[in-house]
């Protein structure tokens, strides 16, 4: 069971809901993933006018934890405003704080993220900041009181996988709140690797929504996250640079 503040999730795969070709594929992929939590940009949602299109109208949101994010925010003030809009609309108080500091790389702004987290914690939100693989920042955010840390695997939408396994592992080893690897996952092996490193969960979107078969990829990601989690718990063998036979040597004298 994954626990983020008071929120409990059976699945360790969190799925983004954007970029799907149509609502039917979106719904089938969400079902295949067996996720418990769906994340979405609050700015994309039609929260008040039921006559306007809703990008999640094909999904039965009553079955899932809604995990709104502040995508589109450039400052702490904007992120806090988006979070308050989500709360006023009756969404879950768990918020992914995403504040982009560079439009080309879509990398997060550490300073504005910290400021936003400080305010949102004071206002009673369950705060999950999206950050670069910076263990110093992660530790400061944990001290501040965030409920999870969401370091990127690689820049959003690139599918480059885990680009900085060393610094990601530093974060995993250094903090006690859940670590959710977010962004850059491109394949099931990327998701499994994140979990093998010791992450508590994986959040992804493009890897599923832009796959040739999003429904099959959603199932593959579900299995990969589960396999990586079990593998990490089982404990891999240490790496060695000398060969060691796996077969016994007894009986060779009779050959």
Curated annotation (Swiss-Prot):
Listed GO CC annotations: cytoplasm
EC number: 2.8.1.10
Major location category of this protein: cytoplasm
Binding site for 1-deoxy-D-xylulose 5-phosphate: 157, 183-184, 205-206
UniProt-annotated catalytic positions: 96 (schiff-base intermediate with dxp)
Gene3D superfamilies: Aldolase class I
GO molecular function: thiazole synthase activity
Top-level EC class as recorded in UniProt: transferase
Described function: Catalyzes the rearrangement of 1-deoxy-D-xylulose 5-phosphate (DXP) to produce the thiazole phosphate moiety of thiamine. Sulfur is provided by the thiocarboxylate moiety of the carrier protein ThiS. In vitro, sulfur can be provided by H(2)S.
UniProt record similarity statement: Belongs to the ThiG family.
Subunit field text: Homotetramer. Forms heterodimers with either ThiH or ThiS.
Name of the protein in question: Thiazole synthase
Gene: thiG
